[in-house]
């Protein structure tokens, strides 16, 4: 019995030392998972310099099948003019951090094709440059970043 107690204490001590060594190991961070855009919604938090005479709201939704739908609602300031809604729809590919948009179509809320070829080209040029996903909270998408009028969309967090 006299030999058993010191051996038991030695075993407990050795176990304690071994567990301390495990705690001092450098933890391995989890492998980052690619962010899925499908099923997410984004709202404009900044639309700079596009128009000073109107209130503009934007909402982007990434729906199934690799399609992004951007709805733009324009309400002229100080007049009783009608609200103008435009829907942009494009295919997207997301290779972080770049979001590439292709095959853009624009329609009115009623589903009618919109705009002149020149205006279409300008809008498509802005969006075909894609966007950048900014890693900060809230997550944001930045379109037309290098121009004077970047469009910044923040992710709508589900409650």
PLM region spans:
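C-terminal motif of bacterial Sec signal peptides marking the signal peptidase cleavage site
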Residues: 16-19
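Positively charged n-region of N-terminal signal peptides that target proteins for export
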Residues: 1-4, 21-22
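Sec-dependent N-terminal signal peptides
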Residues: 5-13
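Intrinsic disorder/low-complexity segments in short proteins, especially the signal peptide
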Residues: 13-14, 146
């Amino acid at each position: 019995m006299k030999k058993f107690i010191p051996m038991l204490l030695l075993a407990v001590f050795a176990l304690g030392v071994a567990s301390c060594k495990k705690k001092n190991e450098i933890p391995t961070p989890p492998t980052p998972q690619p962010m899925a855009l499908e099923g997410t919604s984004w709202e404009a938090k900044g639309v700079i310099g596009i128009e000073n005479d109107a209130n503009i709201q934007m909402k982007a939704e990434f729906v199934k099948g690799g399609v992004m739908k951007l709805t733009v609602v324009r309400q002229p300031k100080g007049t009783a003019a009608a609200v103008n809604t435009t829907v942009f729809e494009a295919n997207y590919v997301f290779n972080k951090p770049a979001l590439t948009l292709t095959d853009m179509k624009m329609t009115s809320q009623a589903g009618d094709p919109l705009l002149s070829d020149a205006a279409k080209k300008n809008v498509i040029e802005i969006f075909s440059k894609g966007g950048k996903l900014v890693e900060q909270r809230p997550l944001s998408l930045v379109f037309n970043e290098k121009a004077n009028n970047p469009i910044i969309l923040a992710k709508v967090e589900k409650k």
